């Protein structure tokens, strides 16, 4: 049996702690999980939510965890696609995959809070459409390692490995369940 961890990076009530303390605790937890044989440590991505979550840059945190661990898989759980450029996501996944020796897992989702969407200038009513477009683009980027724009072909470096072709989709609506099943 494999047991995974999901770390929200919240500041617990009655235990005010700055980001530096939360991040050091995360590294300590990851090292212990690695030593004890846990499967994957997943990090979310949230913005502008106060003490709820300090996980605004999970790619940077996962890079630190990749260097602090040896076997523990490390996962994005989940990347909110309506607020991200799929090219940058593919580049970061490929970089982290190389940095971690192939231990990066990824999941994507449509939903973040209205506060987060609006904070990034995304219209909440358009989040599904943007998610679908960005998800299709991300899949193509991870499979091909390149894209075309205005007649020019651009290649990602590092090139995404075959390990990255499969990911997870967070779903709470019937339409997204169908997408995840595909």
Q: What residues fall within each predicted segment?
A:
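Internal, glycine-rich beta/alpha segment that forms the wall or movable "lid"
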Residues: 85-182
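Short coil/turn segments at secondary-structure junctions
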Residues: 13-17, 80, 118, 122
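N-terminal beta1-alpha1-beta2 module of alpha/beta enzyme domains
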Residues: 1-68, 73, 165
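Hydrophobic alpha-helix-in-membranes signature
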Residues: 43, 57, 79-81, 85, ...
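Gly/Ser/Thr-rich helix-start
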Residues: 51, 64, 76, 108-112, ...
